[in-house]
Amino acid sequence: MLLPESLSFTAWAGALQDFGPALQNTATIALASTAISLAMAVAWLETQFKSRHEALIYLPLLIPQISFLFGMNTLLLQLGAQGSIGAVIWAHVLFVFPYMMIALTGPWRALDPRFGQAAASLGAGRLRQLCAVKLPMLLTPICAAVAIGVAVSVAQYLPTLFLGAGRIGTLTTEAVTLASSSDRRITGVVTSLQAVLPFAAYLLAFIIPKLAHRNRSALQGAAG
């Protein structure tokens, strides 16, 4: 038979109890690294326009992780910061930030500058232009970038293992550890939990712009 003889939530209940801290670490690291990366991306796009140094942002995606994670690990060891959740967040930012830049650069620079100029003519400063004009108009790509950032962070294994010194457990590190386990039920539960956070992020990225733009017909098309 392809179907199990009986259905039970025992494995789920046990896994949620055993891997609750890993789930919490995964969510904390993903949200923190994504928030930091979003702030960095917005700051970069607001102050730089096709800078020649921008290519350096994407280096972590082009070179093997192990080639520079070892050096980062040595540096943090000397600073006494190895094995902390802050170190893991920093490592994740190195990979989340480039992906968020990829997602945001096109829409951000394609936005008609006349919107900002119109706001400036009404006395709005740079910060008010950003908060009242650009961010609402770019809510859809921002939400998409955040969802991508969360997914990228959740998937990180080597940065978590190296910079966390094996002391910061996430669902990804636990899933890899359980890959050779004989208990497929627990492995299935952990990998399912691993997919929950990215799925929730993408679902919110779809829903939030729809709700925010429900009374703005011109922006509803952009949200779709």
Task: Give the residues covered by each predicted segment.
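Glycine/proline-centered hinge or cleavage motifs at structural transition points of membrane proteins
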Residues: 122-124, 136
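Alpha-helical residues within the helix-turn-helix
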Residues: 120, 177
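Peri-membrane helix termini and adjoining interfacial loops of integral membrane proteins
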Residues: 1-9, 163-172
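Membrane-water interface segments at the C-terminal ends of transmembrane alpha-helices
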Residues: 1, 13-109, 137, 141, ...
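Loop-to-transmembrane helix entry/capping segments in MFS-fold secondary transporters
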Residues: 117-119, 184-189
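Membrane-interface capping segments at transmembrane-helix boundaries
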Residues: 111-114, 206-219
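Transmembrane helix boundary and interhelical loop/hinge segments in multi-pass membrane proteins
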Residues: 5-8, 107-117, 126, 139, ...
